[in-house]
């Protein structure tokens, strides 16, 4: 993935305490597996329910960071040692294709949560739709589940595809910032090559040149822009 910088934001919980002459009570924040996440939907089979989450509880065209966990329907417990892969597929009227996606890994410091990303390069419409197939293994037993997922068009364009000078198709997606500000913005983009309709590997050793413009004010640019490198 093409990366300029990573910016990490940490939310620090504070410990509140109160005291009286008789006792002292300390209240600590309750931290759960799903802090900061909202459910998108569930994908189910006869054995498990796969819960999908992100920060706003919805998918959209472009980059989507997704967290998931697997609930056993019999025990109501969440699986802690699953190996998971996924495959999003767009069902068009004349063809099917996938999109760029990451591997799924266990979320650091979490017991039941896994995460990855999917970049939907096109939105659904009245006749064409995305589904998401999740394959996973628990205790050497393989399972699969598939469901249609809702992928509307994004309010702002965050992904596009183009043909390179090598006649190959590429997909480029803006990952960060999610909400650009009038200031210096650290930016992260992903660049992928379409090898076939189902395979979109990360492109290495490319530079992404940027040229921000303000069309409503004489199409001016901005100062001190730096091209993106890996």
Each predicted region: which residue ranges?
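Short flexible loop/turn segments that cap and initiate beta-strands
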Residues: 64, 72-103, 192-229
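Aromatic sugar-binding surface patches on proteins
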Residues: 107-119, 128, 230
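Hydrophobic beta-strand positions in extracellular immunoglobulin-like domains
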Residues: 54, 70-72, 118-120, 136, ...
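C-terminal motif of bacterial Sec signal peptides marking the signal peptidase cleavage site
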Residues: 14-17
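Acidic/polar, low-complexity intrinsically disordered N-terminal segments immediately downstream
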Residues: 20-96, 102-103, 125-127
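Contiguous beta-strand segments within globular domains
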Residues: 58-70, 178-195
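Surface-exposed beta-loop interaction hotspot
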Residues: 123-188
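Sec-dependent signal peptide recognition
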Residues: 2-9
């Amino acid at each position: 993935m093409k990366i300029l910088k990573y910016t990490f934001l940490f939310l620090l919980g504070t410990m509140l305490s109160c005291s009286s002459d008789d006792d002292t009570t300390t209240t600590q924040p309750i931290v759960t597996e799903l802090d900061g996440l909202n459910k998108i939907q569930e994908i189910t089979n006869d054995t498990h329910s796969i819960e999908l989450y992100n920060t706003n509880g919805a998918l959209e065209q472009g980059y989507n960071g997704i967290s998931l966990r697997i609930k056993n329907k019999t025990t109501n417990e969440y699986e802690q040692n699953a190996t998971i892969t996924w495959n999003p597929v767009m069902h068009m009227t004349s063809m099917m294709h996938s999109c760029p996606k990451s591997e799924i890994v266990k979320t650091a410091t979490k017991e039941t949560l896994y995460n990855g990303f999917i970049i939907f390069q096109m939105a659904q419409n009245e006749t064409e739709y995305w589904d998401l197939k999740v394959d996973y293994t628990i205790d050497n037993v393989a399972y699969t589940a598939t469901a249609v997922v809702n992928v509307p068009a994004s309010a702002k364009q965050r992904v596009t595809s183009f043909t390179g000078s090598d006649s190959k198709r590429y997909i480029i997606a803006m990952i960060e910032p999610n909400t650009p500000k009038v200031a210096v913005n650290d930016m992260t983009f992903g660049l992928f090559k379409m090898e076939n309709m189902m395979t979109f590997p990360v492109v290495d050793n490319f530079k992404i040149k940027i040229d921000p413009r303000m069309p409503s004010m004489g199409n001016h640019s901005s100062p001190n822009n730096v091209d993106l490198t890996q």
